From Swiss-Prot:
EC primary class: transferase
Taxonomic source organism: Heliobacterium modesticaldum (strain ATCC 51547 / Ice1)
Assembly, per entry: The RNAP catalytic core consists of 2 alpha, 1 beta, 1 beta' and 1 omega subunit. When a sigma factor is associated with the core the holoenzyme is formed, which can initiate transcription.
Biased composition (Basic and acidic residues): 1108-1123
Matching SUPFAM superfamilies: beta and beta-prime subunits of DNA dependent RNA-polymerase (SSF64484)
Keyword terms, alphabetized: DNA-directed RNA polymerase, Nucleotidyltransferase, Transcription, Transferase
Record protein name field: DNA-directed RNA polymerase subunit beta
A biological-process GO annotation: DNA-templated transcription
Length: 1154
């Protein structure tokens, strides 16, 4: 049963059988709500906590009354352009009261610029877009655990009270049923000592508290204190060893540790969890521990020891909570405020009371620094992944267990990383990185939301047990609430009234999957896709893919490069519109009205209220990852527009739907070994018609600074450079927009002053006669790096004179943007949505590709062996359905007769998509495969027609494009959605002739970024040894590596066309000799005729030659000057020793003379 639904402007035919009962929430609300809470509540809460600040005498009081955020100085676009932070000034109203005089001063104090969140849930920090990732941490509260003591096999129990900030309190038992307590991770004490210290002085009172429990009696026997005072002193000795204990200091220590709100904070969530776990009802406002908490915690531990309690599972999502932007910011702001508080107190005592004002007291530096540090360098403040809209969206919904106060990769075991039953509907079981972070970083599920305590909730439909009806009432449940109920699956069949059709249904209870009678069911899932995240919900036929491959599919969609021509998938899941809409890359109408004017970069809407709305579109901007951000209008003049409607497509969107790749005709067959190891064979048509062409924009910057020798200058006048090289530079020396550049071309001409050399008398005379010659400068222009090329699309110039804010010491800053059009090429990585990835091995002429009976050449050939062992069958079903929907006539679906309008788009939602039968029916309706239309000219007409009749549905006979012969077997063909991933061969290919060498080892540097060489490692040396390739090996170990003299002479010989000389001694060999000598071995090198070979330092002529040839043989020029060395820096070791000895000798002689 297939029916049409509207996905934005486009119609899709969906196979979903389950009606959606609720709309999906806004997908970035986790960021927005949290930040809104911070601005409205979080800030106020902190000022309330810190206020009032009193001096040590209690005479001066500083109160924070109210705060207000001003207007930001620049818009979001301007901030990106100027490299500044998108922030608003925070002003706080402060009151200073002098108790002696009764004087009250009120003032508004500026407390720094506070970064604001953009509409898209991001922050602009120093011009870069960043995202604050939510952190999954253990919730404050009380936790019980049990373990087995290995020798005795007895169960041991423990309890831990974890605060949001403050000292931990831990209880534990031993094999003799003693109960011990640890305060703040110190040595353990009998728990009764703590109970006495709380004011229950004698044994009778302690026994009475716990109804004379036997285990308390056993513990009392070990307790050598008699009353409260002794107990306090005993605790003080453990916490402050070496200090003289007094009862008062001990009492105040215990008070501050657990009962002082300033030093101990359970937070709202900690109090809620403790009350819930221990079944007590302390006021929600009391955020420190109370006596009742501690007594109740011990009672619960005793129950556990008797065998009628339960231990807690720390990986359960009821015990882990999220710290989102707001809370992370609040914690950081609190650190800044507490530092400021210290400064205020100090200033209160120092300053003169008469002239003191709030402004004088408050130093905002610590607050500003704390915020800046958080946004700039916290592990959770991340550079936004902006490869495509899905990458942006997923980044904002990411949940990380790493970061300050969280886990570390090394410490995290298997249990923490594993999928847990409480993840259902809250955290996606599929989407997580491969590699060391697996399971520590997750993604929020589609319908999940965060409650006030930071726990993740998921929606369920309430079942009315009286009437046996599934109602439309939606309840959001946290993980520990859900464990109490029995929850039916979303695919349980219901009738019109909402009653279950069957007597027994599949349901979940805790971690059990049960088949239960309908009467027992409490709740029902709202949607089949509530289990998975956005990226996973975009994979059609997910239910037919192995989880490991689905994980790769979900992750690789985030790496798809936005293409020049977008194309939404034929086979989607119905999520494409929502994902693109909420990612914020499309332009959305703010008000309803009619389109008055549309151009490439602006849309004007005449609104219903008579005003005109201008929508500026983003044109060819660079994203964080160097991909291209470009918006193009999808509305036309005179069109009616509603508020919230998409009026322009962004990158990777097509008619408002997410479009990460292209629909291509694929065939699953082997072809001449070109599909070996998942390689992909591609039709040249995809290159010619720009199917997978993308635009990449690189940014280069050049600044002129003040140096010791004078200012650098950006200019067209560069020494020793011909006019040919300068042809594209303007009169300022900056390249013009539209110029095509190649590696080594000058982008910005810049000269730096050279040090003036000492002049001889003759030169000074000539200078005096002929006037001052132009000062010495060297060329330090910005050039296009190796392997880069393209067109200049934008140039931005910032300078001090124009009043731009630049870094200290910088006078002018030039930014140049180079755009490249990258067509698909061999070595590029491509993938489908099912984890089926591969590298392009060959691009073939269209005429040579296998073709269908109607003459259509296949566009991509994939290896069939990549499917069975990987168990991602979803790709095959997608291929069949894609083929059918491409050829489906819309009229056949609506009225049952052809209308000539070919090609529809379908949606097959996850866990509720098309079945095998649906696909067969669809293929038949679309009239595939078309055996009877083939115009056969072959002699084997009849036999072929018979074999075509036997071709199963969804397959076709293919013909070899080179010979025209049919292939032996029918082959699966159809349309698959393929993505081009951000691992492009242009970014990886690299070659080096000569280049930089490491100063220490004299060997070439490594890596493309350093223009380095390829490492020829130990195993590669073995390979050459095995072949006996002695000369190749010698060359690799000497002149191609660290034989400093040899490589210069070899280079010279090649340049001059002479024979290559014998290699010399590598630098590493000299080090080896020195190391052996340092072990006390007398090692010499002898030649064949047993003469000792002296190892010399670099000769002067070698260095000179190198200079002439323009190669930097060493990081610095260490060749000595003729005659006596001017300073010890320029000598080798032996000379240095001689020099020092001589110097000492002279000094001694002088002393003797005195």
């Amino acid at each position: 049963m297939v029916y049409p639904v509207q996905c934005g402007p486009r119609e899709r035919w969906t196979f979903a059988r389950i009606q959606e009962v609720m709309d999906m929430p806004n997908l970035i609300e986790i960021q927005q709500n949290s930040y809104r809470w911070f601005l409205e509540e979080g800030l106020r809460e902190m000022f309330r906590d810190i206020s009032p600040i009193q001096d040590f005498t209690g005479n001066l009081i500083l109160e924070f009354i109210d705060y207000a955020l001003g207007e930001p100085k620049y818009s979001v676009e301007e901030c990106k352009e100027r490299d500044v932070t998108f922030a608003a000034p925070l002003r706080v109203k402060v009151r200073l009261i002098n108790k002696e005089t009764g004087e009250v001063k009120e003032q508004e104090v500026f407390m720094g610029d506070f970064p604001l969140m953009t509409d898209k849930g991001t922050f602009i920090i120093n011009g870069a877009e960043r995202v604050i990732v939510s952190q999954l941490v253990r919730s404050p509260g009380v936790y019980y655990n049990e373990a087995i003591d290995p020798p005795s096999g007895k169960k041991l129990f423990g309890a831990t009270i974890i605060p949001n900030r403050g000292a931990w309190l831990e209880f534990e038992t031993d094999i003799n049923d003693n109960i011990f307590v640890r305060i703040d991770r110190t040595r353990k004490l009998p728990a009764t000592v703590l109970i006495r210290a709380l004011g229950y002085s004698n044994n009778a009172q302690v026994q009475e508290l716990f109804d004379g429990d036997e285990r308390i009696r056993i513990t009392l026997e070990r307790d050598n204190t008699e009353n409260t005072e002794e107990a306090l002193v005993e605790i003080y000795k453990r916490l402050r060893p070496g200090e003289p204990p007094t009862v008062d200091s001990a009492r105040s220590l215990l008070e501050t540790l657990f009962f002082d709100p300033k030093r101990y904070d359970l937070a709202k969530v900690g109090r809620y969890k403790i009350n819930k776990r221990l079944g007590i009802s302390v006021e929600r406002e009391v955020r420190h521990l109370t006596k009742d908490d501690i007594i109740a915690a011990i009672r619960e531990l005793l129950k556990l020891m008797q065998g009628d309690g339960r231990a807690d599972d720390i990986d359960h999502l009821g015990n882990r909570r999220l710290r989102s932007v707001g809370e992370l910011l609040q914690n950081q702001f609190r650190i800044g405020l507490s530092r400021m508080e210290r400064v205020v107190r100090e200033r209160m005592t120092i300053q003169d009371v008469e002239v003191i004002t709030p402004q004088v007291l408050i130093n905002i530096r610590p607050v500003v620094a704390a915020i800046k540090e958080f946004f700039g360098s916290s592990q959770l403040s991340q550079f936004m992944d902006q490869t495509n809209p899905l990458a942006e969206l997923t980044h904002k919904r990411r949940l990380s267990a790493l970061g300050p106060g969280g886990l570390s990769r090394e410490r995290a075991g298997f249990e923490v990383r594993d999928v847990h039953h409480s993840h259902y509907g809250r955290m996606c079981p599929i989407e997580t990185p491969e590699g060391p972070n697996i399971g520590l970083i997750g993604s929020l599920s589609t319908f999940a939301r965060i409650n006030e305590y930071g726990f993740i909730e998921t929606p369920y439909r309430k079942v009315d047990k009286e009437r046996g009806v599934v109602t439309d009432q939606i309840d959001y449940l946290t993980a520990d609430e859900e464990d109490k109920y029995i929850v039916a699956q979303a695919n349980a069949p219901l009738d019109e009234e909402g009653r279950f059709k069957e007597k027994r249904v599949n349901a979940r209870h805790g971690h059990d999957i049960l088949v239960v009678p309908v009467e027992k069911v409490d709740y029902m899932d709202v949607s089949p896709k509530q289990v998975v995240s956005i990226a996973t919900a975009l994979i059609p036929f997910l239910e037919h893919d192995d989880a490991n491959r689905a994980l790769m599919g979900a992750n690789m969609q985030r790496q798809a490069v936005p293409l020049l021509r977008t194309d939404a998938p034929y086979v989607g899941t119905g999520m494409e519109f929502k994902a693109a809409y909420d990612s914020g890359v499309c332009a959305i109408a703010r008000k309803a009205g009619y389109v008055e004017r549309v151009t490439g970069d602006e849309i004007l809407i005449r609104c219903d209220d008579g005003t005109t709305e201008h929508h500026k579109l983003l044109k060819f901007l660079r994203s964080n990852q160097g991909t291209c951000i470009n918006q193009k209008p999808i509305c036309h003049k005179g069109q009616r527009i509603e508020a919230g409607q998409i009026i322009a497509d962004g990158p990777s969107t097509d008619q408002g739907e997410l479009a990460l790749g292209r629909n291509v005709l694929v065939a699953f067959m082997t072809w001449e070994g070109y599909n070996y190891e998942d390689a992909i064979l591609v039709n040249e048509k995809l290159v010619k018609e720009d199917y997978f062409t993308s635009i990449h924009i690189e940014e280069y910057e050049c600044d002129s600074r003040d140096t010791k020798l004078g200012p650098e200058e950006i200019t067209r006048d560069i020494p020793n450079v011909g006019e040919e090289v300068l042809k594209d530079l303007d009169d300022r020396g900056i390249i013009r927009v539209g110029a095509e550049v190649r590696p080594g071309d000058i982008l910005v001409g810049k000269v730096t002053p050279k040090g003036e050399t000492e002049l001889t008398a003759e030169e000074r005379l000539l200078r005096a006669i002929f006037g001052e010659k132009a000062r010495e400068v060297r060329d330090t222009s910005l050039r296009v790096p190796h392997g880069e090329a393209g067109k200049i699309v934008d140039v931005k110039v910032f300078s001090r004179e124009n009043g731009d804010e630049l870094a200290p010491g910088v006078n002018q800053l030039v930014r140049v943007y180079i755009a490249q059009k990258r067509k698909i090429s061999e070595g590029d990585k491509m993938a489908g949505r099912h984890g089926n990835k591969g590298v392009i091995s060959r691009i073939m002429p269209e005429a040579d590709m296998p073709y269908l009976p109607d003459g259509t050449p296949v566009e991509i050939v994939l290896n069939p062996l990549g499917v069975p062992s990987r168990m991602n069958i979803g790709q095959i079903l997608e291929t069949h359905l894609g083929w059918a929907s491409k050829h489906m006539d819309r009229g056949v679906l609506i009225e049952g007769k052809p209308s000539g309008e070919k090609g529809i788009r379908v949606a097959t939602p996850v866990f509720d998509g098309a079945t095998e039968d649906d696909i067969f029916e669809f293929l038949t309706k679309a009239g595939l495969p078309k055996a009877n239309e083939i115009a056969l000219t072959d002699t084997r007409t009849e036999s072929l027609r018979e074999s075509m009749a036997a071709v199963p549905l969804g397959k076709s006979i293919l013909y070899d494009g080179r010979t025209g012969e049919p292939f032996d077997n029918p082959i699966t063909v159809g349309y698959m959605y393929m993505l081009k991933l951000a691992h492009l061969v242009d970014d990886k290919i690299h070659a080096r002739s000569t280049g930089p060498y490491s100063l220490v080892t004299q060997q070439p540097l490594g890596g493309k970024a350093q223009f380095g060489g390829q490492r020829f490692g130990e195993m590669e040396v073995w390979a050459l040894e095995a072949y006996g390739a002695a000369y190749t090996l010698q060359e690799i170990l000497t002149v191609k590596s660290d034989d400093v003299v040899g490589r210069v002479k070899t280079y010279e010989a090649i340049v001059k066309g002479e024979n290559i000389p014998e290699p010399g001694v590598p630098e590493s060999f000299k080090v080896l000799i020195k190391e052996l000598q340092s072990l006390g071995l007398d090692v010499k090198i002898l030649s064949e005729d047993e003469r000792e070979i002296e190892i010399k330092e670099v000769e002067e002529d070698v260095a000179e030659t190198a200079k002439e040839l323009g190669i930097d043989i060493q990081g610095e020029d260490r060749s000595e000057r003729a005659g006596e060395p001017a300073s010890p820096d320029e000598m080798d070791d032996e000379e240095e020793i001689d020099y020092a000895a001589g110097f000492l000798q002279d000094a001694l002689e002088e002393l003797e003379e005195d």
